[in-house]
Amino acid sequence: MATPFIAGVAVAATALAGRYGIQAWQAFKARPPRPKIKKFYEGGFQPTMTKREAALILGVRESVAAEKVKEAHRKVMVANHPDAGGSHFLASKINEAKDVMLGKTKNSGSAF
């Protein structure tokens, strides 16, 4: 007497689980695509900053106009300024990158 009842409950539970599984799969497939995350440069800083490294830090090409360099510098500094919780080390590297891109290098390297 209990066996048919247990079998019925098992069939009902399987049907409900299948229904919710199908609904979850359809919702998963219908979700909007996530934007692709930009891949970050995996290397560290060089002892003496090159123009290529400066361009990578500022997010510009190596052969870009001075106005674009200044605009990129401002954008990156706003995001990483020490007064806004950013790192002093990164701020010095960003400033050094701007100097390298604008041709104002002192060949002294970073203070850090």
Curated annotation (Swiss-Prot):
SUPFAM superfamilies: Chaperone J-domain. Gene3D superfamilies: DnaJ domain. It is found in: Mitochondrion; Mitochondrion inner membrane. Its main location: mitochondrion. The keyword Iron does not apply. Residues 53-112 form the J domain. It is a single-pass membrane protein. The modification N-acetylalanine is found at A2. The chain crosses the membrane at residues 7-23. The keyword Plastid does not apply. Keywords: Acetylation, Membrane, Mitochondrion, Mitochondrion inner membrane, Transmembrane, Transmembrane helix. One of its GO terms (cellular component) is mitochondrial inner membrane. Belongs to the TIM14 family. Component of the PAM complex, a complex required for the translocation of transit peptide-containing proteins from the inner membrane into the mitochondrial matrix in an ATP-dependent manner. Probable component of the PAM complex at least composed of a mitochondrial HSP70 protein, TIMM44 and TIMM14. The complex interacts with the TIMM23 component of the TIM17:23 complex. This is Mitochondrial import inner membrane translocase subunit TIM14-1. It comes from Arabidopsis thaliana (Mouse-ear cress). The lineage of its organism: Eukaryota, Viridiplantae, Streptophyta, Embryophyta, Tracheophyta. The gene is TIM14-1.
